[in-house]
Structures are given as structure tokens and as C-alpha cells.
Amino acid sequence: MDRAEKKECVESLSEVFKSTSVVVVAHYSGLTVAQMQNLRKQMRAAGAAVQVAKNRLVKIALEGSEVASIADLMRGPTLIAYSADPVAAAKAAVAFAKDNDKLVILGGAMGKTALNADAVKSLATMPSLDELRAKLVGLIQAPATKLAQLVNAPAGKLARVISAYAEKDAA
């Protein structure tokens, strides 16, 4: 890798650290190429991405960023997983690590907050942004639905009473 490629890599990583809300760092030693491809595929499906880069270049890219606290984790064969959704990268990484013990989650960062491995696992159990939005919409719609049911209930009861009288008279 020549100097220009290294500079381009650092700029790319800096842009990633500026645009993402969560970064997860993990050791990937012992993963086969097929397993790494599977990890990347699962990350893409979750709306996250995985990148492997030289630790020194990652540390340079981290300087001055909000997630600079993860620089200490960059030792050995590490990968970074990141996403715009605050929980997508953590969920995908933890799910893959459950099935494959060779992926060891070291920690990460969410904004300026540094996360240890347990915090990343806790983050993975939280609902995603889309799930929270769906719950919020459901909560907002619930009173309107109940109001509509209450308004329609008396008319329905009246119709059933009239129907019962009609059946009684017919018999």
C-alpha cells in the first residue's frame, strides 16, 4: 500500500466515523474467508457494514472524531462494524458472534460514549430505530382506533336489538 492509498484509506475511514452513530470493534482471528463473507452479508442485510483496515490507519482516522475512544481497542487482527442505525451493527455482530466463537467483540462507541463488550451486547438487545418508530405510531393510533370503536358500538348494539325483535316477530 503506497502513501496515496493510505491517505485515501484514512480519509474514507474518517468519513465513516463522522457519518455513523455506532462503531463496534471485534477480533476476527481464525475466521475463514467464507465466514467473513457471511458476516459481511449479514451486516449488509441489517443495514450495517464491516471493514478491515490497518490498525495504525484506523487510529489516524480516529483522531479528532467523536469515536476516538475506541483507539485503544485497535490491537491485533481487528475489524470495525458500523451503521447509521444505533443498534444495527451491534445486533448483527452479536448475533454472528453467538454462532461463531472466533469473532470476539472487544467494545465500541456510540457517539462520544465508549462501550465495553458487555455494553455492546446490551445495545444489541435494544429495539432498532424502525421498531421504536412502529411502536410510537401504534401508540398514537390506539386512542383513535378505540374512539372509533366506541362511536360505532351503540349503532351496532341498536342494530342487533332491532334484528332480534325482527326475528322474534317472525317466529
Swiss-Prot record:
Q: What is this protein called?
A: Large ribosomal subunit protein uL10
UniProt keyword Repeat, yes or no: no
Q: Which family does it belong to?
A: Belongs to the universal ribosomal protein uL10 family.
Question: Can you state the subunit structure given in the record?
Answer: Part of the ribosomal stalk of the 50S ribosomal subunit. The N-terminus interacts with L11 and the large rRNA to form the base of the stalk. The C-terminus forms an elongated spine to which L12 dimers bind in a sequential fashion forming a multimeric L10(L12)X complex.
**What molecular functions are annotated in GO for this chain?**
large ribosomal subunit rRNA binding; structural constituent of ribosome
State what this protein does.
Forms part of the ribosomal stalk, playing a central role in the interaction of the ribosome with GTP-bound translation factors.
- Residue ranges spanning the membrane: these are none
Q: Name one Pfam family in it.
A: Ribosomal_L10
Q: Which organism is it from?
A: Methylocella silvestris (strain DSM 15510 / CIP 108128 / LMG 27833 / NCIMB 13906 / BL2)
GO CC terms: large ribosomal subunit
Q: Which domain of life is it from?
A: Bacteria
Q: Which CDD domains match?
A: Ribosomal_L10
In its keyword annotation, does this UniProt entry include Ribosomal protein? Answer: yes
> Could you provide one GO biological process annotation from this protein's UniProt record?
translation
Provide the alphabetized UniProt keywords.
Answer: Ribonucleoprotein, Ribosomal protein, RNA-binding, rRNA-binding
PROSITE patterns for this protein: RIBOSOMAL_L10
Cross-referenced InterPro entries: Ribosomal_uL10, Ribosomal_uL10-like_sf, Ribosomal_uL10_bac, Ribosomal_uL10_bac_type, Ribosomal_uL10_CS_bac
Name the PANTHER family for this protein: 39S RIBOSOMAL PROTEIN L10, MITOCHONDRIAL (PTHR11560)
